[in-house]
Amino acid sequence: MVTVGNYCEAEGPAGPAWTQNGLSPCFFYTLVPSTLMTLGVLALVLVLPCRRREVPAGTEELSWAAGPRVAPYALQLSLAILQMALPLASLAGRVGTARGVRLPGYLLLASVLESLASACGLWLLVVERSQARQSLAMGVWMKFRHSLGLLLLWTVTFAAENLVLVSWNSPQWWWSRADLGQQVQFGLWVLRYMTSGGLFILGLWAPGLRPQSYTLHVNEEDQDGGRNQGRSTDPRSTWRDLGRKLRLLSGYLWPRGSPSLQLTVLLCMGLMGLDRALNVLVPIFYRDIVNLLTSKAPWSSLAWTVTTYVFLKFLQGGGTGSTGFVSNLRTFLWIRVQQFTSRGVELRLFSHLHELSLRWHLGRRTGEVLRIVDRGTSSVTGLLSYLVFNIIPTLADIIIGIIYFSMFFNAWFGLIVFLCMSLYLILTIMVTEWRAKFRRDMNTQENATRARAVDSLLNFETVKYYNAEGYELERYREAILKFQGLEWKSTASLVLLNQTQNMVIGFGLLAGSLLCAYFVSERRLQVGDFVLFGTYITQLYMPLNWFGTYYRMIQTNFIDMENMFDLLKEETEVKDVPGAGPLRFHKGRVEFENVHFSYADGRETLQDVSFTVMPGQTVALVGPSGAGKSTILRLLFRFYDISSGCIRIDGQDISQVTQISLRSHIGVVPQDTVLFNDTIANNIRYGRVTAGDSEIQAAAQAAGIHDAILSFPEGYETQVGERGLKLSGGEKQRVAIARTILKAPDIILLDEATSALDTSNERAIQASLAKVCTNRTTIVVAHRLSTVVNADQILVIKDGCIIERGRHEALLSRGGVYAEMWQLQQQGQETVPEDS
């Protein structure tokens, strides 16, 4: 009968890591399985947030193809199953060849942990295959490589099998194959080596994730149809494509074009490294003080050591939650770098938004876009701060602690720190992911509760009309109770997280302290070493206590950053062609030739529109709402590109010249004038930002608003308010006309510039517009036909087509649509609504 003995059996409770010309089997089979188990669980944790894609209705199951990559995936799956079974087979081999010798406890632990770690890898392999198949079923290529966690697990497993080779000359291992037991273990090791090596190589290839491995059948009768190449809208893990996100983020870490800030970044990195050194030196000097006090050292040595310790403590930080001189200096220096980064991101986003088309802006809520900009900017600076100055330093402290305790204490101390901190991080991530849904539900219910209160107060009179105060109070009470129930879950889960963290640190401190006390009692360590270990572990616990918060913030920032980068990836619809030159303006002849155009819905807004505006002429566009009149102006200004046909100015295709040169020759007076929340002078100056005050006043006089401006208490420095709401409709239109006069364009576009004004204001504005349009090519969109009776040509547009054209008298004599519209307006029947 086989029995289990002590953990390390002959090596004692804590033998050395290197003994008899090789690694200690006890140490090796404690470290490696623990590491693999940690990596396996961590890989699973990072996959937990990934949700399964919903396969669209009508999409059938994917079938295996007879392609060359199906067999490699089957081999990969077989190797993963074999790898999971081999540790148990090794344990069975040990039991079968023990011959009455007690098995050390570490073998049992190693077999269980290695099998569980391999099971994690197998499960991840199947899940990633399933995700790839679902992605393919939706016509979206999700990825063509395994996750970082799975690759790391296979890499470390293969590296561990190679690490065994350093013990080739050690009699503790099976290399001599002296008996049946060693021969069995050697054979199993060869099998493990081949298995782990095969998984490592196949993992880099990832045959099970290649699209050629599948055949997609959708609705059988449409098998030859193209795949949907649209972007998937499924919720994705925050940590997916982490490497790509970090590469994008790293571009903002280095302030390009600013040598002084680059030097500041290097200095901050140096200070961060100094902080890591201080975290080691402070416990060391604390240990030295205890040892000096214990050994009754001379006062001079003690005073020098205490002084040095206090100085290092000043540099590091005085107590819990406080920051020291080095950290404060680094924070101070980083302010300029953070401002540089924030400024660069905001300017890049702002420039990109102005490059996007009018179609894009009309389809988006401005508030939503600005939230993406604000959150995206803060996410970049926040991520840099959290990652560079919180997460990375904490992980560095853990690694330094593992190395230090392994080298200067005993390898078992390094293993204890590694297991304790790994378990701490894994449990923190798992519990944080688990409790995220409680926080999300609580926020949703909080919004609903506030909405309930706001809705009730906004309808105050209605509540009074129906004596519904009690009903509203009860509804609000129910909403509060529901919110508080979710709040309790969120708070209780936070308490559970904190208690879990406390237990892990407590067990780690207990294990390390007992081992340290054992070595002190054996005279292998000093009393100060016991103090050093406890101080360093407690010191690590302080930043780790905030790890859950950092994790949540990084999650949120990654999401905001993704939205920002999605915004930056929006394609510019209207672009200058390569090699486009400036518009060479001569006289101002405008031509539309067989122009077709449609918006996103596919319905043609303009159909075969052709007309010519001779230099200095005025052409009016009239017709019912939605006919396409304003669209013609937008196409000429090149807010959109036409579907077919050609638009020319002085014989030059406007799609072949630069947009900025085209728009510099065109002035627009829109129907709904929107002014900036600035002074009247600056709103007029917007027509030409280099204009002086005298030019602004001259433009205002030409627009007939100079006297009205002077009547204001602050004159030209009067603030117009948001969107110009402090001015009347007529005053806003005159400011817009003055702005256009100041621009002095060669072509004028008037988009129902007076339709929203009363009769007296309209006549005054028409007089101002007549001055602006003199000797300039002008296109007018008109609602009131009386304003265009003197136009050189009137185009009647209906359903995107020009159905009549001519001068006012000729169109009336023809008795067509224009004559009917004129008759109705003369009778005072406003049957033609304003154009949209």
Swiss-Prot record:
GO cellular component: cytosol; early endosome membrane; endolysosome membrane; endoplasmic reticulum; endoplasmic reticulum membrane; endosome; extracellular exosome; Golgi apparatus
EC number: 7.6.2.5
Cytoplasmic side: 48-72, 128-147, 207-264, 327-375, 419-499, 551-836
Cysteines engaged in disulfide bonds, as pairs: 8-26
Catalysed reaction, written as an equation: heme b(in) + ATP + H2O = heme b(out) + ADP + phosphate + H(+); coproporphyrin III(in) + ATP + H2O = coproporphyrin III(out) + ADP + phosphate + H(+); pheophorbide a(in) + ATP + H2O = pheophorbide a(out) + ADP + phosphate + H(+); coproporphyrinogen III(in) + ATP + H2O = coproporphyrinogen III(out) + ADP + phosphate + H(+)
Tissue expr: Ubiquitously expressed. Highly expressed in testis by meiotic pachytene spermatocytes and post-meiotic early spermatids.
Start and end residues of each ABC transmembrane type-1 domain: 265-556
Membrane topology: Multi-pass membrane protein
PANTHER family: ATP-BINDING CASSETTE SUB-FAMILY B, ATP-BINDING CASSETTE SUB-FAMILY B MEMBER 6
Record protein name field: ATP-binding cassette sub-family B member 6
Organism: Rattus norvegicus (Rat)
